Amino acid sequence: MDIGCKVLVFFTCFLTVTAEIYIVTMEGEPIISYKGGDNGFEATAVESDEKIDTTSELVTSYARHLERKHDMLLGMLFVEGSYKKLYSYKHLINGFAAHVSPDQAEMLRRAPGVKSVDRDWKVRKLTTHTPQFLGLPTDVWPTGGGYDRAGEDIVIGFIDSGIFPHHPSFASHHTTVPYGPHPSYKGKCEEDPHTKISFCNGKIIGAQHFAEAAKAAGAFNPDIDFASPMDGDGHGSHTAAIAAGNNGIPVRMHGYEFGKASGMAPRARIAVYKALYRLFGGFVADVVAAIDQAVHDGVDILSLSVGPNSPPATTKTTFLNPFDATLLGAVKAGVFVAQAAGNGGPFPKTLVSYSPWITTVAAAIDDRRYKNHLTLGNGKMLAGIGLSPSTRPHRSYKMVSANDVLLGSSGMKYNPSDCQKPEVLNKKLVEGNILLCGYSFNFVAGSASIKKVAETAKHLGAAGFVLVVENVSPGTKFDPVPSCIPGILITDVSKSMDLIDYYNVTTSRDWMGRVKDFKAEGSIGDGLEPILHKSAPEVALFSARGPNTKDFSFQDADLLKPDILAPGSLIWSAWSANGTDEANYIGEGFALISGTSMAAPHIAGIAALVKQKHPQWSPAAIKSALMTTSTVIDRAGRPLQAQQYSETETVTLVKATPFDYGSGHVNPSAALDPGLIFDAGYEDYIGFLCTTPGIDAHEIKNFTNTPCNFKMVHPSNFNTPSIAISHLVRTQTVTRRVTNVAEEEETYTITSRMEPAIAIEVSPPAMTVRAGASRTFSVTLTVRSVTGAYSFGQVTLKGSRGHKVTLPVVAMGQRR
């Protein structure tokens, strides 16, 4: 008996040490594509882009059948207690996630009925004024009955870090029309385990959390991660409010109002699927379970501000893995998917969103800039940033460096110039003066914050504070932070050195270097009001860039990514009271943050408006409408520009390309009436996969349950509103099919342009398309010279009734 217990304990410890999470895909169709024939179960599949009635007896009985098969396989192979099944995936893919040892994973790979076994991998988050910037209040919301009808009955699902349900952006009473029951959504609402109150209120229509993989990996901490849909990070609340937050919510911090916030579709319903957490991000097994559940519940739109930390270990292509295959199933079910492009810019091939069925969103800087200035006693004015009030007008204040006002007893266990600890600074010397602090790497790493600098300065009675940057690494992002007292961050190193030189020259010291008299003076300007720039939009420095890649050897794909550009820099939106994702906004109700995480929900919300107006449109049709009506011209009438590094590693502006912005910056009002669309369905996506060189047909069958019987000839013939040819030899012709979604017949003139290395020709030069009808046209590209670089161009279809449809063209000429 004693020996048996010891053996059991040893075996359990062995599993704990070596077990990992694996995602297993099985033979047999998931619910979305099952056509019947398995043990007498009737078909559950519907036509592409249609929704399944997940409550029907057909669906529920087949779902139970699949789960029993998963359990039977595990029970047949392994002793009970030696493994843990985390999820059964039944709706979009047929498989399960399990916590098993590597040896057990190998047994699963060899087991009959198993198609693939993938070790789980991590994902990460890709982290007001924009409705006006995009023209929603004047040009879009009125067409749907006003802001209190914009997005009516459209459900947006958020795969993110949860939601703070008590925020006014999500209040159900902030509307003139009460929310009633939704006609088709079937998701459930979890309760707060502490208050026993539901997370749902009519505006929030579904709320669930997924953490089985996180728990199995030992990453989940219930004290800070919350075993509920509660947002312990802030990121999820921020993204949900961007897409579907209530209209006209005052953004207040430190006694100041920074405008009024609104979601893109303020009447849309919010369905929360929490699968990301504050410290470790998330696991694909949890994210796949969340997506599977969201589509089962009946969401219309999925917003994904999430991407992989690294490529999956066992897949050969970027398009085929459990995550992308699940999203393909979602699109097949009629769900539009917006995913953040990633924050690896401005470097090429940094995208984390690859597949043609996903709408990949890059981040733009809009026309609002928060600038401030510091005026020195010698009259020199230094530019900086800071969302703060000014010091008293017509008055200068002495400036004191934190390093010069240290208390003698302070232990130097941290960098005192960071100004994070008021107790180590001499209040008598700081009081009434401007505190001069240093912006060290600790601010980049998150162990120091501007919020704490402001609190330190206020505690010491300072008139304000200045942060100087003495050195900076490429990629360092400086965002303005709201402050309760006057404050400014001097982001330019040369200007910071001007300030330091002025301070050192004017400060009187004894022979030991101790200050005898502080004589440097300065005053801080008013940084509360934004300045509007006509150069907007611009592609943000951090926004991931193309070209798209088809495998993890970084070979270029014949598919343009990103797809579209949307606001993603300095976005005001809701924040969780528990949020710790941004140190500067801990405990606040709103946050001003940047990332492609912020761009994706803009597109999700705008897609909801398009879906509201055109409820029968497929995800590809919605994507096409957004892309073909986007703009490549900024507010000043110039071609879009992108932030980029110069040779000296300073940030500069260069002419942007489709690898920066895709088709262009979103134009919501035009997207509601695009004239023509480039539609595509499930078979088109399979055709793209089957014609992409290097993708094995067996692998396609494993992940999609669909054989390669489609004749597309070349992946560039996939019917998307862009053309990309990574290996153009001599001449190649591609075709596109357009459908007239306007109410009347229209004649389109087709023109094209291309950079000199590639010749371009379109045929026919004009065509008439009846309402509801489809026509094809061809684009022929010919290599004129091999330059070793991509050439960029555009095809434009200009309609006789005012519609204008554009698609970008990218191609690289090769000798063979």
Curated annotation (Swiss-Prot):
Its EC number is 3.4.21.-. One of its GO terms (molecular function) is serine-type endopeptidase activity. Glycans are attached at residues 504, 578, 702. CDD domains: PA_subtilisin_like, Peptidases_S8_3. It comes from the Eukaryota. Residues 418-492 form the PA domain. Residues 1-19 form the signal peptide. Residues 120-672 form the Peptidase S8 domain. Gene3D superfamilies: 2.60.40.2310, 3.50.30.30, Peptidase S8 propeptide/proteinase inhibitor I9, Peptidase S8/S53 domain. Residues 22-124 form the Inhibitor I9 domain. PROSITE patterns: SUBTILASE, SUBTILASE_ASP, SUBTILASE_SER. Residues 20-126 form a propeptide. Keywords: Autocatalytic cleavage, Glycoprotein, Hydrolase, Protease, Secreted, Serine protease, Signal, Zymogen. Pfam families: fn3_5, Inhibitor_I9, Peptidase_S8. GO terms for biological process: proteolysis. The active site is at residues 160, 235, 597. It is found in: Secreted. GO terms for cellular component: extracellular region; membrane. Belongs to the peptidase S8 family. This is Subtilisin-like protease SBT2.6. It comes from Arabidopsis thaliana (Mouse-ear cress).
